Every structure is written in structure tokens, then in C-alpha cells.
Amino acid sequence: MKRAIVIPDQHFPIHDESAVKVVLKAIEFVKPDIFINLGDVGEWSSVSGHKYKRRKRPPLEYQLPEIDEEIKAVNKQIDRFDKVLDKVKCKERHILAGNHDEWLDSFVEENPYLDQYSFKNACKWEERGYEYRVWNDVLTIGKISFVHGAYTGLSHARTHLERYGTNIMYGHVHDVSRHSSTRLLDGNISAWSMGCLKDMSAEKNKWLKGRLHNWNHAFGIVTFFDTGYFQVEVIDIVKGECSLWGKIIKG
């Protein structure tokens, strides 16, 4: 038997500090064998295509200091996770790049001589010991797969299940949702949307222009049995605290 902790979109440095602290404490408590980051690790507003939508893009020498500062801020937060993962001796670590993370790669496509700014290189994933997957490349362990997230809309969990046709866990949409189906040969299969760890306030999400959302703070625990089957626990984080196996964890 092995256990994994799965975290959804963090959007560092626009994260919810109390939610992140809950997850860090949960890692210490659970002591997982596997750690899976579903991506959108950074907000990456410095390289967002929306940044210069209504104004002219400045010369590169004006862009780089802001990009460098955001990379530094994101790495500082990743370091916090690596520190606690090292402490509990969790060696198997996976990173599944998200669409926001892909913005760094798009920046490098425009500036191919700046390869050090790719998401993989800027966050030093290989150096950190993570197995790296590009945006929506699928990770499969036993009888469940993991991906950043490919579909949105009201029925995104159902759409992920129908398109992938297997047990699938993803982030991307920031809400907690599940859809299940039964197949004649495969039995019950499900899709889990895992919420986010992002600051959900209107002040930090001005692009919503005051619209309400259905986002939730959460993380997942997956227990893998020797048969390849598994058990999923979606742990909701409510106002900076959660209940985990009879223990109250406060961020």
C-alpha cells in the first residue's frame, strides 16, 4: 500500500496562505509516499498574454526584471513544499504543468535564446527531483490517472470522464466536483475536480470583474492498494482549516 497527496492549482504568489499551511501540515501528518502537483504552480502574470492586451509590450529589458521577481517568488513557495517532503522522506514527486505554467514556455518560444525561462528550467524541477510532464500530459498510477485539466463548463467532471474514459483526477477549474459512471467491463469509474489553493478574493481576481465563483480550497489523498485499486479522499479546507482522520489541522 502507498499513499499520495495531490494538490491543485496554487497560483503562487497569489495563493491562500492559510490553505497552503494546512496542506504543508497535512503532508507532515500523512507522510505520503508520493506527491503530485496538478499544475498552475504560478500565476505568471508577468508573462500573461492578457498583460499587454490593451497596451504596447515594452522592450525585453523592461520585462525581464518583473519576470525574474515572479520566478523568485514562485520558487520560494515550492521550496516550502520540498522542505516538508524531504522531512517526511517522500521521494516520488510529480509535476504536471498547467496552462498558466505554459505561459512561461510561450515566452521562451518568442525568445528562444532565453531557455532558462521555460517553466521546467525556471522552477528547477529536475534539480528538485520531480518527474515533469508538459501541460495535459497524463500521469497514470495503478488504475487512476492525473492531468492538469482540459475541459471547463458546468459539466466539466462529466466531460473529463467521458473524454478520458478512465478514473481521472484534475485541477484547472478551481472547484470541487465528482462525476461517476459504470462500465460493463471496467465497473465504476470517476472523475474528480480537486479545487485550488489560490487566494479566492475579489481583490486578487479582478479579472472576474466582481462576478461570483464556485471555487473551493481542497487537496486530495489517494491510497493505492496492492491490487492497483485505490481510494480517494477529497479534503475540503474551510476558512483555513480541515478535519483529517480525526485531527483538526489549522493553517
Can you say where each PLM-predicted feature lies in the sequence?
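Conserved beta-sheet core of the metallophosphoesterase superfamily
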Residues: 143-235, 240
